[in-house]
Amino acid sequence: MMCDQTSNITFRLFSNMSDFLRSRIGRDLFIVAIIGLIIRYVVGAFFTYPTDVNYWVIVSENLFSNEGLYGLPGYYYTPVWGYVLSAVTSVVGLLGIPLGEYVPELVGPNMVLDWTNTLPSFGYAMAIKTVLFIFDLLVAIVLFRIGMRLYGEKRAFWMFTIWFLCPFTIVISSIRMMFENLEILLLLLALLCMVERRPSWAGVMIALSLMTKPYGIFLCVLMIGYSYVQSQSMRYTAQYICAMAVTALVLFIPVILNGQLDEAMMWLTNRAYDTGTGYNSTLNLVPFILFASFVASALMALSGKASITALIVTNAVLTSMTLLNPGNIQYYLVLLPMALLMSYRSNIIVIIAFLILSGFAFISYSTWSSVLYVHEGYIGSDLLESFVSILRPIDSTLSYNWFKSVVAYTVVAVPLLECVRRRYAER
């Protein structure tokens, strides 16, 4: 059920921020935000995983050379993240911050790295991280707003806090420097717009999310059925679908006209042949899971009954099924907000699994990530060698992959077991 007893000050979160910050909940959230940002900057100052940020350096160099996102090899994603990189590159250029440099001596049989010889400068890395930290904070704010609508102030506060202080979230933005949080932000904005009966904006946001990374595809389909149930009108659903289609078209028209569609889709198409990440096996399952999402959406529309929590749980289960075969660690971040939004008390199990996974992620990334600062003299090579010698024996690929699977299986199993328990209790 939606919480009807939310205070007026909460719904003025974006329109009257000063009043909100003077409230008790506003002060508490502000303190959590400050603590989370301090942790991120401290961790980010010492650790930078050198891939894929090496590609961000190459993309920025392409932009400075007026080659665009796809003019030279280096950028293999759809344009949304590229536009963010373009903005960061402009600011970095205005401030005179160097992008990075080519360091051939880093690659070799006795070197720490064996896959990249392009390192970002400290300033460039921190500029990218700052943008990712802002996305983390915006995700927390949107989670809070959705939580207020669904569950009330106390639950919404803990959703904000768990997301923003979760070590897993911090590792991905501070060390791994991947933009999963941008995809999640757009996904949650789509969900919020649907909750607040704004189908056109929901369509825009879900399209932007899909054009960032494709994990919103199941929510995209499920919201077709949910939008019809919300209004009992095809016009409402048509607004959602049309806004989504127009947004996707606007984003891709320049790419198509320049003949760069292959490059824009390379991240997805290359994964079909990538046996190292397990993504190729996952792609074989996607048509079946997508079919299941269409069936669920149709059943939702035909029944005339749907709750936002049922929509969230169904999306969490379908999305986690694509991650049952262990893939890259950052992909699993999309499951965390879904777990926080599920109404079942058992989602604490999912949170615990994420906390354990955070430890493995930190150990795995940090053993490789300080080479940038050794090169720049930020820390000594002896200190890095000592640090790595302690952590590397703990970094077990077998255990690491096992816990990634545990997270995905838990997100599938917990809501299903809870449904069975509730049915049994009703008898």
Locations of regions flagged by a protein language model:
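The feature marks long extracellular or luminal low-complexity segments
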Residues: T275-Y279
